[in-house]
Amino acid sequence: ASDVYKRQGHGSSLSCSSSGYNSSDVNQLTNTDVHPFFWSVACVNGDFTGVTCFAETWLRATHNETGEPTGAIATLMSTINQSWAPPMEGQDHMNLILTEMSDNSQSRSFGGISMNGCMKMNDTYGSSGNEMTDTWTCFGDPSVMVRTKAPENIEVSYNSSISSSSSFDLFCSLEEALVTLSVDGEILASEIISQG
């Protein structure tokens, strides 16, 4: 499971300056079953030169007793000082995509949502947006699929026996659902439902 963190405010390479939340606080996290993804509009939270920066700390955090991961699955943080309006535009568009309110983008990966937000920022602010895109760095796995609600059971129908052919029909009540065929825990194929 994941939560989304969106932050705007002053930053440093080791902290969210305006709140005082810093790398030491991240290293004290105890959650081992919920790992957030994080978009930050703040100066230098991703400045990784010469120090383990705030963004890296989020990815490396582990429980002090068990050693299990407690940090983020991915972050988008700036390596330089950020301006205000362009990255706010980018983050606003990331939120629209994440909550499926954007008419122009259907990205589901952290990197896809992040880059689509950057492109909207670039379209709106030109070279000022481009500068922010150049220095907003994705830490973690950009291909991780993110969502705003837990997966649900869906109604699916298919033949009870499947031949060894390379395809078979499956019908589902939810358009664009991801379905997976597995045998004894081994994934054989995954596809997206199209036209029921």
State where each predicted segment sits:
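Short, small-residue-biased leader/transition segments that mark boundaries at the very start
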Residues: 1-5
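Aromatic sugar-binding surface patches on proteins
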Residues: 194-196
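Beta-strand-rich binding/interaction modules
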Residues: 165-191
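Active-site-proximal C-terminal subdomain of hydrolase catalytic domains
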Residues: 41-42, 46-154
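Surface beta-strand/loop "capping" patches
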Residues: 145-175
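Alpha-helical scaffolding within the catalytic cores
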Residues: 16-30, 51-64
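Long, His/Glu/Asp-enriched segments that create or flank divalent metal/ion-associated functional microenvironments
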Residues: 6-11, 46, 174-176
